Amino acid sequence: MADPFANQIQNRNFLAPVGFKFTLSKYPKVAFFSNSARIPELSLGTATQPSYLKDIDIPGEKLTYGDLTIRFLVDENMQNYMAMHNWLKGIGFPETPQQFADQTTNVDGVRDPLEVFSDGSLHILNSNFQDVAIVKFNDLFPVALTSLEFDATETDINYFTAEATMRYTVYNIFDTDARTRL
């Protein structure tokens, strides 16, 4: 006989919003002290089937992925901020074409247009701060980076945070071994 509890949720703990970490494969040594990240929205377009009574929406065939925005604490040496800043400037090359050439040259000195992209991972952690799932983003690239506002009139020390907005081709959610899609 079938077990009536086989399809029940085994872990009754709720997922807390404080358990996550973000990494970029392009900058493995740069720590992103992320204090805010979200799995971007995912939407499916619809097509309208005309009818003499009421038009009927039917599922479309193209998914739309929202932007990935991470908010992170800026380290004292500004390494994480400058990594995003220089990556963005390298893609947009506002001063010289050499900036783009530098951005698209890999560590072996070979030009590779794919160097403008990086894969990234958002690790979702449980209440014991162990991986529950890994959201893998393919072909990330930055499109916006917030400013840092210096203010000598501040009476309290508020550490800088910055937001980086990135686009990507697709994301997938994997289990903790990063091999099986959930």
Predicted segments with their positions:
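Glycine-rich, low-complexity intrinsically disordered segments
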Residues: 1-182
